[in-house]
């Protein structure tokens, strides 16, 4: 959070685009908030409740997805740099709270000593090879992250191209997605995992995601696309369930390393996904397209989730 705060300060002061890139680099180097939060939840919750805890992170993200653009718009109306100052202040307050107030999650005897071999991008990923089921579940998570990349990279282009939506309609779409995500991950995640188990909620989430992407891809009207938003929200069951299953396969001292590895997979997917989906979109709407299919990126994302379901079935046989 300190690095993120510094990033926003640089963007608020930026006289040119070079400063913006510098801020983004600092943010990327210090981007451990989600992995640290995941490790903390794994440390302080019993195994059977971890998926629900991870779901709360998703619910918080959904809340930010709703409130962030609204607050940023209000602040930016008076000064375009003010939203960055507000974001910097929020990040730094969060960092101070974590450092001075939040207690340590592990007793000293369960902590793992620091090693520089974990300080490289590959070191933490080695843990994923320590167990066959863990590696397969990590592959499921990676496919989910890769499929998710279609939304920030292509969704706005798609709805503008196919339905003629402007910024206002897109804003309502994003708000609806955030609200639905909050409901599923914040309210439904815990009772559903308690009733059906993490394995079943993982499959249900992947199935809903695959169906939702098909709805998006084949939607000929904007209202049909919107009808897919609640279905897609239940995809939010998959990520926390997969994380919960993975945390049960490593020791208490390895939870932070595991969350770092998961964050690494997310970063790799973020490198590959935008280019993959935007090029697919361009290919299927371009003049050389033999079959004009604007929704092709979403259908590709659906196939990735179906592949993830296959891997998850093989990895979790016998698990609840």
Predicted ranges, named:
Residues 13-18, 30, 164, 218-220:
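Helix-breaking motifs and short loop linkers at transmembrane-helix boundaries and internal kinks
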Residues 1-10, 200-215:
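Structural signature of the two symmetry-related core transmembrane helices
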Residues 184-198:
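Helix-to-loop junctions at the C-terminal end of transmembrane segments
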Residues 103-140, 162:
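Juxtamembrane intracellular "pre-TM" segments in multi-pass secondary transporters
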Residues 23-62:
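Cytoplasmic helix-loop-helix junction between adjacent transmembrane helices
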Residues 76-89, 279-305:
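A membrane-interface helix-boundary motif in multi-pass transporters
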Residues 153-170:
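Short amphipathic helix-loop junctions that connect adjacent transmembrane helices
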Residues 95-101, 299-320:
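Multi-pass alpha-helical transporter architecture, strongest
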């Amino acid at each position: 959070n300190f690095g993120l705060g510094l990033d926003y300060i640089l963007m608020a002061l930026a006289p040119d685009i070079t400063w913006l890139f510098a801020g983004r680099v600092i943010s990327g180097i210090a981007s451990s908030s989600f992995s640290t939060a995941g490790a903390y939840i794994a440390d302080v919750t019993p195994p059977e409740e971890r998926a629900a805890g991870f779901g709360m992170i998703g619910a918080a993200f959904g809340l930010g997805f709703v409130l962030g653009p609204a607050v940023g718009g209000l602040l930016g109306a008076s000064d375009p740099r003010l939203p960055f100052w507000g974001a910097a202040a929020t990040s730094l307050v969060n960092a101070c709270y974590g450092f001075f107030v939040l207690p340590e999650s592990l007793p000293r005897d369960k902590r793992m000593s620091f090693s520089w071999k974990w300080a490289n991008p590959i070191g933490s990923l080695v843990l994923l090879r320590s167990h066959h089921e863990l590696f397969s579940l990590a592959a499921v998570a990676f496919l989910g992250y890769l499929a998710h990349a279609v939304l920030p990279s292509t969704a706005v282009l798609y709805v503008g191209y196919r339905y003629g939506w402007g910024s206002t309609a897109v804003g309502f779409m994003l708000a609806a997605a955030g609200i639905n995500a909050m409901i599923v991950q914040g309210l439904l995640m815990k009772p559903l995992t308690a009733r059906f188990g993490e394995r079943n909620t993982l499959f249900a989430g992947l199935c809903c995601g695959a169906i939702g992407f098909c709805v998006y891809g084949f939607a000929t009207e904007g209202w049909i696309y919107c009808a897919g938003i609640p279905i897609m929200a239940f995809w939010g069951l998959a990520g926390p369930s997969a994380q919960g299953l993975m945390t049960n396969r490593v020791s208490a001292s390895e939870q932070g390393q595991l969350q770092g590895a998961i964050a690494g997979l997310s970063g790799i997917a973020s490198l590959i996904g935008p280019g993959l989906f935007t090029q697919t979109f361009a290919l299927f709407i371009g003049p050389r397209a033999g079959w004009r299919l604007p929704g092709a990126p979403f259908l590709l994302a659906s196939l990735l989730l179906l592949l993830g379901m296959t891997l998850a079935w093989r990895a979790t046989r016998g698990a609840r």
